């Protein structure tokens, strides 16, 4: 199916269950300043960097093209990380500004985006990206540190969730999930 057909499939799924796509973003997103689905989507795209998107995959679909592949699915934390694991991810980078105390089936590095969250929920965190905003590290330095952590994690270093014994899964239900 084409990218547009896949997008229409997701939109049809929402409509068939009497839901409006624009009920997303979640209350937590709204508290953080995201007001529309477009705002949330722009944030997702920015996290992909500057590489061109080579394919849009169905939920839990496995990549067969080299490059940046986008995976269709809901923004729900546990459902999306379960889908990434089913798609074959070996390490997941999960950025959060509010903190989410869960563990996915694959090692999931929690990347905290602000110092306040790190101060209050340090045992949930794997990487503090808030050091960029505080000026403690440059973007390049933090990127290098995160890259090293990804390599260590892929080589067997446990994530914070794994050390706490958290290994939840959540399969996308037949219906709308925010």
Predicted feature residues:
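Active-site rim loops that border cofactor/substrate pockets in soluble metabolic enzymes
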Residues: 23-79
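Short glycine/threonine-rich loop-to-helix capping motif typified by GTGT followed
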Residues: 4, 34-42, 103-108, 171-178
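Flexible, glycine/charged-enriched surface loops at secondary-structure junctions
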Residues: 14-31, 157-169
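Hydrophobic alpha-helical bundle architecture
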Residues: 56-119, 131-135
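Gly/His-enriched, cation/cofactor- and phosphate-binding structural elements
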Residues: 124
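Conserved structured core elements
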Residues: 4, 74-78, 144
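Single conserved hydrophobic/aromatic residue that forms the stacking wall/gate
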Residues: 1-10
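Extended hydrophobic packing segments that form well-structured cores
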Residues: 88-90, 95, 106, 129, ...
């Amino acid at each position: 199916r084409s990218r547009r057909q896949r997008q229409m499939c997701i939109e049809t799924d929402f409509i068939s269950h009497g839901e409006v796509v624009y009920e997303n973003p979640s209350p937590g997103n709204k508290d953080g300043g995201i007001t529309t689905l477009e705002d949330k989507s722009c944030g997702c795209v920015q996290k992909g960097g500057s590489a061109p998107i080579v394919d849009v995959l169905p939920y839990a679909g496995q990549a067969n093209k080299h490059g940046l592949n986008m995976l269709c699915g809901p923004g729900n934390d546990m459902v999306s990380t379960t889908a990434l694991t089913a798609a074959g991810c070996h390490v997941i980078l999960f950025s959060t500004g509010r903190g989410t105390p869960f563990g996915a089936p694959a090692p999931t590095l929690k990347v905290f985006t602000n110092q306040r969250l790190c101060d209050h929920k340090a045992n949930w965190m794997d990487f503090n990206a808030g050091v960029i905003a505080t000026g403690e590290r440059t973007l390049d330095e933090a990127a290098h540190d995160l890259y090293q952590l990804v390599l260590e994690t892929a080589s067997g270093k446990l994530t914070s969730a794994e050390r706490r014994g958290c290994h939840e899964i959540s399969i996308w239900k037949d219906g709308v999930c925010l």
